[in-house]
A protein has these predicted regions:
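Conserved small-residue-rich beta-alpha loop and adjacent elements
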Residues: 100, 104-166
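N-terminal Rossmann-like NAD(P)+-binding subdomain of aldehyde/semialdehyde dehydrogenases
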Residues: 1-118
């Protein structure tokens, strides 16, 4: 098959998804065991990285916006796609706020003892890998990724194609 045929592209996508899935599964094992301080440090590092890379992010977003406008997308869609210094700062603050939340992992939600003495507990545990597909809203990437990390889960995030560069 030639590289341009749809069958080849589908096979390439399938292989890419397997690679991403395997990497996410491996990461999920580490995240599930990560301490709250480790997860919080990662969230704060993500916030710092957003701030440090804001110029490059805004430049990439400008390319996404140009393509969206050329494609005749609605003004409301373009507004949701648009990043500014203030919006990037809000994304970074959101990650820091997630870091300040209590660790949800290991919290006992319920416990009971059966008449035969057998004791049960319902405890919050990480799910493992969470896949999220969402509209072209760059801020969702930070919010969803941050919440997944806080809960000890790996995430596979897929934004709309209009925000790939952002």
């Amino acid at each position: 098959m030639s590289a341009g045929r749809p069958e080849q592209k589908a096979e390439d996508l399938r292989e890419a998804m397997f690679v991403i899935g395997r990497a996410a599964r491996a990461a999920s094992r580490e995240l599930a065991l990560a301490s709250n301080s480790t997860k919080n440090a990662a969230l704060c590092a993500m916030a710092a990285h957003l701030r440090q890379q804001s110029g490059a992010i805004l430049q990439a977003n400008a390319a996404d916006l140009e393509a969206a406008k050329a494609g005749g997308l609605a003004a409301s869609f373009i507004d949701r796609l648009t990043l500014t210094d203030d919006r990037i700062e809000a994304m970074a603050r959101g990650l820091e706020e997630i870091a300040e939340l209590p660790d949800p992992v290991g919290v006992t939600l319920a416990e009971w003892t059966r008449p035969n003495g057998l004791r049960f507990e319902r405890v919050r545990v990480p799910i493992g890998v969470i896949g999220i597909i969402y509209e072209s809203r760059p801020n969702v990437t930070a919010d969803a990724g941050g919440l997944c990390i806080k809960a000890g889960n790996a995430a596979i995030l897929r934004t709309g194609s209009d925000a790939f560069r952002s």
